[in-house]
């Protein structure tokens, strides 16, 4: 996993509440098994007018000024619903590095973290201020300081210490285990012969 320390990007507002994982990535696209390629299907029912991928010009992701945004500002209960990790894959493949919401579905929150994204919980007034930024305004997220720096202010956020450590060091679960490789090897050497 890529390290996440300080990230600067532009925002796109999608202030709907209760965006569930089926809206993020509909079930018909769950057959793909590689993490790459899901970005095309992100918010499929909202982004496209038909199954020929004719873009809906009124949907915010399709507006030229927001196409390169990498920080999503959204409503409460983002990622509710099923546990499909594919929804996080779609967000990451589309290019999102940070999602700022009022709250997250528990499993989806962890799926975003496991895929190197930073989900941040902020109150409505902060999200509204960020949602009203100009499309060219830069926002910086500093994980070490746990702060968001923007033209409309500086905001603190919370994150579990273990997740913070994993993101700052680019460690997934396997990477964490490999930190203890010497101890594991030593333990295996000292096991009774019938276990080896």
Swiss-Prot record:
Q: Disulfide pairs?
A: none
Pfam families tied to this protein? Aconitase_C
Q: Which GO terms describe its biological process?
A: L-leucine biosynthetic process
Q: Name one GO cellular component term.
A: 3-isopropylmalate dehydratase complex
What reaction gets catalysed by this protein?
(2R,3S)-3-isopropylmalate = (2S)-2-isopropylmalate
Keyword Amino-acid biosynthesis included in the entry's annotation: yes
Q: Does the keyword Transmembrane apply?
A: no
Keywords of this entry: Amino-acid biosynthesis, Branched-chain amino acid biosynthesis, Leucine biosynthesis, Lyase
Q: Which InterPro entries does the entry link to?
A: 3-IsopropMal_deHydase_ssu (IPR004431), Aconitase/3IPM_dehydase_swvl (IPR015928), AconitaseA/IPMdHydase_ssu_swvl (IPR000573), IPMI_Swivel (IPR033940), LeuD (IPR050075)
- Broad class of enzyme this protein falls into: lyase
Q: What is its EC number?
A: 4.2.1.33
What SUPFAM superfamilies does the record point to?
LeuD/IlvD-like (SSF52016)
Q: Which GO terms describe its molecular function?
A: 3-isopropylmalate dehydratase activity
* UniProt function note: Catalyzes the isomerization between 2-isopropylmalate and 3-isopropylmalate, via the formation of 2-isopropylmaleate.
Q: Which family does it belong to?
A: Belongs to the LeuD family. LeuD type 1 subfamily.
Q: How does it assemble?
A: Heterodimer of LeuC and LeuD.
- NCBIfam families in alphabetical order: leuD, PRK01641.1
Q: This protein is called what?
A: 3-isopropylmalate dehydratase small subunit
The lineage is: Bacteria, Bacillati, Bacillota, Bacilli, Lactobacillales
């Amino acid at each position: 996993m890529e390290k996440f320390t300080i990230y600067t990007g532009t925002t796109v507002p999608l202030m709907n509440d209760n965006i569930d994982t089926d809206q993020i990535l509909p079930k018909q696209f769950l057959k793909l098994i590689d993490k790459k390629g899901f970005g095309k299907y992100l918010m499929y029912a909202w982004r496209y007018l038909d199954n020929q991928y004719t873009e809906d010009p009124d949907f915010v992701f399709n507006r030229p000024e927001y196409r390169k945004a990498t920080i999503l500002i959204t409503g409460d209960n983002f990622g509710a619903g099923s546990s499909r990790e594919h929804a996080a894959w779609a967000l990451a493949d589309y290019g999102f590095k940070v999602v700022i919401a009022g709250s997250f579905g528990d499993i989806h929150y962890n799926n975003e973290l496991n895929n190197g994204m930073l989900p941040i919980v902020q109150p409505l007034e902060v999200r509204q201020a960020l949602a009203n930024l100009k499309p060219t305004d830069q926002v910086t997220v500093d994980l070490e300081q746990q702060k968001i720096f923007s033209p409309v202010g500086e905001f603190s956020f919370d994150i579990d210490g273990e997740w913070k450590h994993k993101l700052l060091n680019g460690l997934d679960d396997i990477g964490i285990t490999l930190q203890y490789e010497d101890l594991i090897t030593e333990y295996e050497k000292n096991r009774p012969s019938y276990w080896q």
